[in-house]
Amino acid sequence: MKFFLDTANVDKIKEFNDLGMVDGVTTNPTLIAKEGRDFHEVIKEICSIVDGPVSAEVIALDAEGMIEEARELVKLADNVVVKIPMTKEGLKAVNVLSKEGIQTNVTLIFSANQALMAAKAGATYVSPFVGRLDDNGQNGMDLIAEIVQIFTNYGIATEVIVASVRHPIHVIQSAEMGADVATIPFAVLDKMFNHPLTDKGIESFMKDWEEFQKNK
């Protein structure tokens, strides 16, 4: 399973990319606004760091506006993927863009119906939001299992990106269910490195080594 980093923070992207953990990046207008920088400049810099796909979201809500924005976004770098909202207008745009060879990531997916429709329209990726479903009293991971099964049944090439990841368990469940990608906030990815028994083991090794050095 691929790890995408869900952030527009260039320093964090560099940090985790140096560890070999970043297969791609997803951004949205909120994440970029937090950086206080020009939208296009941020996307270009991220694309220069990461070899994999970098999702950049359109702002327009009408198909014509989305298509126009998408054509401009893909001029920024070869690895830009255009993020499109799951609406009728969004899928209309996806249908046009896919025929032009422009990769798309349909976001704000909350049902298998939506994922299937996005795939039919030609989406490269679909992004179901598991954390937000959990917040709404549903089990977000059930949706991932459902989408993966449907796509497997029919050999659908659209990749499933598990989004709105809240904790490391979401990541492991995504891998168990066969999702193609989990897009992970850096705070969650950072937690995945740690386990108390690892810390305890290192502490024990160091004590043993110090004791050995004393007795030499």
UniProtKB/Swiss-Prot annotation:
GO terms, biological process: carbohydrate metabolic process; pentose-phosphate shunt
Matching InterPro entries: Aldolase_TIM, TAL/FSA, Transaldolase_3B, Transaldolase_3B/F6P_aldolase, Transaldolase_AS, TSA/FSA_arc/bac
Keywords, sorted A to Z: Cytoplasm, Pentose shunt, Schiff base, Transferase
The organism's place on the tree of life at top rank: Archaea
Pathway: Carbohydrate degradation; pentose phosphate pathway; D-glyceraldehyde 3-phosphate and beta-D-fructose 6-phosphate from D-ribose 5-phosphate and D-xylulose 5-phosphate (non-oxidative stage): step 2/3
Name of one Pfam family that matches: TAL_FSA
UniProt subcellular location: Cytoplasm
Functional note: Transaldolase is important for the balance of metabolites in the pentose-phosphate pathway.
HAMAP family to which the protein is assigned, alphabetical: Transaldolase_3b (MF_00494)
A GO term for molecular function: transaldolase activity
PANTHER family for the chain: FRUCTOSE-6-PHOSPHATE ALDOLASE 1-RELATED, TRANSALDOLASE
Catalytic-site annotation from UniProt: 83
UniProt name for this protein: Probable transaldolase
GO cellular component: cytoplasm
